[in-house]
């Protein structure tokens, strides 16, 4: 029986999180314009992604997330930062070795106001050579007992800059002047 279960757990594809949580997050959380730009790349596996919400110090407690996304109005960019080891994204499947992008949840700060935790589409590795971008720490945490094919990993940011459009905008927007607009029920984001 042990051999049977070992075999069955190995049937999960290393890109399972890409085709499930990552793709569905973009379909549900991205604006129509963002989805039109990213989904063809995702569907053709030109972008490989993961869903990075869980943090070491908070598990899946979204309210406790410490990773920050601070809006730089002058440059129209987000500065993504991991302020402590507790804020490292930890365990996301497909993150350790495969992902080039991550749907990452971070606490949104605009003009010193905390607007809560929102999702971002963040490039973490080059699609050309698969190396992490400067300001991104990413790696594999080793095998998971009984789930060897899943490459769980860790992710941290050191004042990593991404374009304003990295914020997934179906339910929220921050314009170039830093005005925050929520569309619909914020519970739909999680």
What does each model-identified segment do?
Residues 142-190:
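Glycine-rich beta->alpha junctions and the first turn(s) of the following alpha-helix
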Residues 46-53, 135-139:
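Short Pro/Gly-enriched beta-strand edge/turn motifs at strand-loop
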Residues 1-46, 97-98:
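Internal helix-loop-helix
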Residues 32-36, 59-64:
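Fold-level signal for large, globular catalytic cores of enzyme and receptor domains
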Residues 73-137:
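A short core secondary-structure module
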Residues 25, 53-60, 86-88:
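Sensory/regulatory domains in signal-transduction proteins
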